[in-house]
């Protein structure tokens, strides 16, 4: 008997076939750099920086920016942001800089130039006759890069959220060490005229480069990161959610994964922790691999690890976390099953902690405490054999650990308990549910059962 086949009758004929579907329609690409060459882009001919500044500022005031000119200017302006490398900096085998080296954002990547002249029009008229200062260049760079952040804010954020962010960014870039170079609301007006900056590959590359530089190098103008910070771990919401989850429940990654009782986690965990990736290396190219063009389809997105993502946010919902209630359910990744496991794990980690004394008045008190704890442990280990203490723990409902939780799930036939459902309904019904969010899913799925 072939376990993969099914047998049925069609038009009086017995048919045997293997039902096969495409399980994963995407080919995920890992961001490892195989050729030991820094990430690279090609731009037009390097401009005269003073002329470029006046042209781009004029375009911003007129809400008519030329993306090619903007990218050419941002690359040329990197020379203004020199800093000192604090340690030897390597990533994927590439030496970026030695400790003590003077570096600019340009040191992290390779920017090639061709002979194509920029446009450099003065679309907003000629207002500035003198040459700009470094502070003015820094302010313009900061405002331009902030268009990336604004274009990444999704339509789910209602009201004046985006306008408020734009206003706060403008305030940053008119306060020392920056200087005011545009009128109020210019940034939002410019964004509205071209809202898709985050989809322009060269602009995205430059935003990621600036962010990678300022995240490591202490600099007078480090606040430029306010517009680029969204390039860090971009399209890695699955991995980022997992990292936040283990911090939230105070376990290591290894300890947390022991609670993932479902076969669909296997491929996702393997994908998330692919050997050779610098997922745990500070200041690696990995952190900005999407913006630097090192991967087409991220293996770390919420869709790539949808079961892990769903489970983590169901646990978050159980704990009443707004971020989880607002997150979007990955509908194709067993949300009903993940909500069951999420209920049990939520119960396991919510409202209970592991506590012990760690601080003492003096060394004598510390030694007395340690001696008393050793005695307690010895007594606990002296099992007289009359009770199978493991089984007793499983069925008492008080034991902690993967085995105890798994036993509780099995005892209840893989179904949620009434207390779990009440908790889910309580947290989701008190929340303004967004479409397709975890809050909406829990409300629709369990409100009639409570």
UniProtKB/Swiss-Prot annotation:
Protein's UniProt keywords contain Ribonucleoprotein: yes
InterPro entries: Rhabdo_ncapsid (IPR000448), Rhabdovirus_ncapsid_C (IPR023331), Rhabdovirus_ncapsid_N (IPR023330), Rhabdovirus_nucleoprotein-like (IPR035961)
Keyword annotations of the record: Capsid protein, Helical capsid protein, Host cytoplasm, Phosphoprotein, Ribonucleoprotein, RNA-binding, Superantigen, Viral nucleoprotein, Virion
Coiled-coil spans in chain: none
Residues modified as Phosphoserine: 389
Record PTM: Phosphorylated by host CK2. Unphosphorylated protein N seems to have a better affinity for leader viral promoter encapsidation. Phosphorylation of protein N in ribonucleocapsid may stabilize the interaction with protein P, thereby playing an important role in viral transcription/replication.
Name of the protein in its database record: Nucleoprotein
